[in-house]
């Protein structure tokens, strides 16, 4: 089975200088992958020449004449830049030419463009952004939503949980993964009305619901999945990133304070190296836009080639394991957010493959 990946080569802070080398490097370790490099042909070609990959048999260059910058508002991305590398890459997925799209571009634009081009799966009202955050268990906690939906209804949180359950089941090979609802306490009576109502829906659902969890449970690995609205999730994610940078900076500062601490650093290097590998942010790069009729992976905008390659791997793994089909089946007999609250059945099974109706 060949996995074809459409790369938005112009997205992110570094564009082709990161995306193209990452794509070529990924091909060297994955014989069943093909790359569709989307963007300005001259810029992509120059990078391929540097990498001696101009005639790579598993690389196709698809031209796009426009670039969505990190500062472009959503309306510009949607209405004015219709031939952007981001949009063309998403269209490759819609037309069945690619199995997944990976972009380091503007998050808001990517969500808007992807939703416009691919549409949502039937039964899903709102797509959500999900990623994995490292935990003490070593396998990471899947957290969503991370910013796509600042305000949610209880049924939306139930839908997010179902989408994450489907993804974790096939990608991480965990049958019946545990689901936690992010709250200000474990007690059922804690939280605002939306969270309390969402808890009732989750307890009544077919999911393996653990109950309410707190922020520290994300890092303890108390549950496989943690669900929250996009406002809370984005704050949690940015706080995590900030804390990680601060701790790294403080450790470096302390170990370089004097000749003695530098000597200690040499002695502690094996331990520090193992810790660095466990907490390497590059390994967790790549957030999945769940709920669409095609796979879209969002890389961190400041990612280097090593980090972007991990985002490519996330798209590859999701495509290889049939995440879209699994989510579609999970919602085949479920309704939208309102129906999810009442448990009414959905009459039409979702179509996991984009077609002319998703134009």
From Swiss-Prot:
Pathway: Lipid metabolism; phospholipid metabolism. Keywords: Cytoplasm, Lipid biosynthesis, Lipid metabolism, Phospholipid biosynthesis, Phospholipid metabolism, Transferase. It comes from the Bacteria. Gene3D superfamilies: Isopropylmalate Dehydrogenase (3.40.718.10). InterPro entries: FA_synthesis, Phospholipid_synth_PlsX-like. One of its GO terms (molecular function) is phosphate:acyl-[acyl carrier protein] acyltransferase activity. HAMAP family: PlsX. Catalyzes the reversible formation of acyl-phosphate (acyl-PO(4)) from acyl-[acyl-carrier-protein] (acyl-ACP). This enzyme utilizes acyl-ACP as fatty acyl donor, but not acyl-CoA. This is Phosphate acyltransferase. It comes from Cupriavidus metallidurans (strain ATCC 43123 / DSM 2839 / NBRC 102507 / CH34) (Ralstonia metallidurans). The lineage of its organism: Bacteria, Pseudomonadati, Pseudomonadota, Betaproteobacteria, Burkholderiales.
């Amino acid at each position: 089975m060949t996995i074809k990946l459409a790369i938005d080569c112009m997205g992110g802070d570094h564009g082709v200088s990161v995306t193209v080398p990452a794509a070529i490097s990924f091909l060297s370790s994955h014989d069943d992958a093909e790359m569709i490099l989307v963007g300005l042909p001259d810029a992509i070609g120059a990078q391929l020449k540097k990498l001696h990959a101009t005639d790579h048999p598993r690389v196709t260059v698809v031209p796009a004449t426009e670039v969505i910058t990190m500062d472009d508002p959503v309306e510009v991305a949607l209405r004015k830049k219709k031939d952007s590398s981001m949009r063309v890459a998403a269209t490759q997925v819609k037309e069945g030419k690619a199995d997944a799209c990976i972009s380091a571009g503007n998050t808001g634009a990517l969500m808007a463009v992807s939703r416009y081009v691919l549409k949502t799966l039937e039964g899903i009202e709102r797509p959500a952004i999900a990623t994995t955050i490292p935990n003490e268990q070593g396998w990471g906690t899947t957290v969503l939503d991370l910013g796509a939906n600042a305000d949610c209804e209880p049924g939306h949180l139930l839908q997010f949980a179902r989408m994450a359950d489907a993804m974790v089941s096939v990608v991480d090979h965990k049958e019946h993964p545990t689901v936690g609802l992010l709250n200000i306490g474990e007690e059922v009576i804690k939280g605002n009305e939306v969270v309390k109502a969402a808890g009732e829906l989750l307890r009544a659902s077919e999911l393996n619901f653990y109950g309410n969890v707190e922020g520290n449970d994300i890092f303890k690995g108390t549950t496989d999945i943690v669900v929250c609205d996009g406002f809370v999730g984005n704050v949690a994610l940015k706080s995590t990133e900030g804390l990680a940078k601060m701790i790294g900076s403080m450790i470096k500062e302390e170990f370089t304070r004097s000749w003695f601490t530098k000597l200690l650093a040499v002695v502690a290097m094996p331990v520090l190296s193992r810790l660095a590998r466990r907490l390497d942010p590059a390994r967790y790069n790549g957030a999945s836009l769940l709920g669409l009729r095609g796979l879209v992976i969002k890389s961190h905008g400041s990612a280097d080639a090593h980090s972007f390659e991990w985002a490519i791997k996330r798209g590859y793994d999701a495509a290889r394991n049939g995440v879209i089909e699994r989510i579609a089946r999970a919602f085949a007999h479920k309704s939208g957010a309102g129906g999810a609250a009442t448990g009414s059945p959905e009459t039409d099974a979702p179509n996991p493959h984009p077609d002319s109706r998703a134009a």
